[in-house]
Amino acid sequence: MIHFLPANMKHNKITDSDLATLTNGESNFVSDVWVNGKKIVDRDITCKNGYIHKVEGVMTSADNMADIVASHANMKTFNYLLGRCSAPYYDDAATKEYNRLYNNTDSVFVLRHFASTANTGNYGAATSGELAHDPDGQAVDAKLLYDPTWNQYIYSNTSGYDLHYDAGAMLVPSDKAFNTWWNADGKVLQDMYGSWDKVPMNVLVKLMNINMINTFSETVPSKFKNIVDNTTKVSLGLTTADVDSCFMGCNGVVYLLNKVYTPADYRSVSFPALINSNGADGIMSVIYWGIDNLNFEPYLNSMDSYYSLIIPTNKAMLTYVDPCSYGTNRTKLYRFTYNNQRKTVVANRYDYDLATGVVDEASKDSVTNADQVKDRLEDLIDNLIVVGNVEDGHTYYKTKG
């Protein structure tokens, strides 16, 4: 149950105008009390064995954020995109309880979203963790920030907070807003993939996650400036004028928007690598894995600086001469490849003759130390980032490395 109580709203600096937006104009004062979308019209009626609070209507259980999106007539596009990030998972505990109650022999499956914060436990034993594998145990291409179907969602924190302290929030563009964006700022995706069905998950999730907010209390309308791009941490510029209406769920609030905010990932120099990094079929999946996993995104997605990025293809990543082996008796060559099952980059190392350009295939040695792979990739990417442009006729340029 979602409670809007005066003391709590004061503590979280929720204003009268915030409450007006959240209740779609039904309340304008934080002195009001709201429980699950219903206003308390007479409170603290004292009885011999407790208190009665009179509400203005019949109070019903609230849907979660995913259910709100699924049932709204103007959120069909966002609901479809959410569905691409989900799968039904067999729940053994729920199956046993269901069959016990109904004397049946059926199986119970629970819809869950691939997410960095999700319920990884079974029925009756919720556990917060990362859901990074599909029901068959295969690693997924990308994850949402959190699972909007989890009724007990609370962001990961070190303060010991549980679901009673806060909730999530979702910015859901209307179908009309999505159609407008698809033919304007999103035209590059339309030109490359043709339809939403064909946009790869690792590309799509960038757009989804910019609309998923970990905390509700810190991002109410008066604090919209706190809603930032996931990588650049620059404010999106969301205003109440962009909000059509609000819907309170049991695990967070859903804001229906009349516009789509484009993630910085779609405008940065690394975008060509992103859209060519789709698993085993991507021709730049190796280098983009490095950009995505070695914390280069905040740097490359910055719109306040000008960079040039040299992007090697997967084929080029088979010919990396290890600079650490220069000046030694045996120069080493790395062949980096993308392991689509594990969703990670692996490498083999070979002896290499610099003079002849011949690789000694018999010297193949698998690099089992993941940190060594990351170290070489990080050094390489540092030297692929040029400060400024590379079109002014100079022979040498300053790199990040």
What are these regions (language model features)?
Residues 1-401:
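Mature, structured domains of secreted/extracytosolic soluble proteins
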